[in-house]
């Protein structure tokens, strides 16, 4: 069973989301499409087997992370997501179209933990060979960890297909 952590920016502004509309607003988020159920990606759990590939367990990130007393929401999110990366085998990083400073940080953390990392980029936005906002961290991560793959895609559906077809890490 491959334990997968997904990292990427939500495409709905956080200030628009509340407990009454969270499931509706995030139902089209790529996490929901990968897992096959919006609720399983919103509320923190120990992991859920994805609908279209019984060989993959989604272990994070979640919209609502577990909250520890004494920590701010932001401190808690960082703490919980680093724990999720610690227990995963694979980090899927979505660097298409949206600025994702947290994703860059999670990729770097995963690289130091020697995790398998697959970074998906839009060729029109990011060219790590020449220009684009992500070239430096992508090259750095590739130099730190031999288990990093960069895949240029035209559509986020390709990320879903990749996860649905995962059999083993290599």
Where are these regions (language model features)?
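Conserved catalytic or regulatory cores that recognize and/or transform ribose-phosphate-containing ligands
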Residues: 1-170
């Amino acid at each position: 069973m491959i334990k997968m952590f997904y990292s990427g920016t939500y495409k709905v502004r956080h200030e628009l989301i509340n407990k009454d509309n969270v499931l509706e607003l995030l139902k089209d988020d790529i996490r929901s499409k990968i897992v096959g159920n919006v609720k399983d990606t919103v509320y923190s759990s120990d992991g859920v087997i994805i609908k279209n590939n019984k060989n993959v367990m989604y272990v994070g990130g979640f919209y609502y992370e577990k909250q520890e007393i004494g920590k701010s929401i932001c401190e808690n999110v960082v703490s919980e997501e680093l724990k999720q990366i610690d227990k995963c085998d694979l980090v899927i990083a979505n660097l298409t179209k949206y600025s994702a400073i947290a994703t860059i940080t999670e990729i770097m953390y995963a690289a130091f933990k020697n995790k398998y990392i697959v970074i998906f980029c839009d060729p029109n936005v990011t060219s790590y060979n020449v220009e684009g906002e992500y070239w430096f961290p992508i090259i750095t991560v590739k130099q730190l960890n031999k288990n990093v793959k960069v895949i240029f895609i035209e559509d986020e559906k390709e990320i879903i297909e990749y996860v649905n077809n995962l059999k083993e890490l290599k």
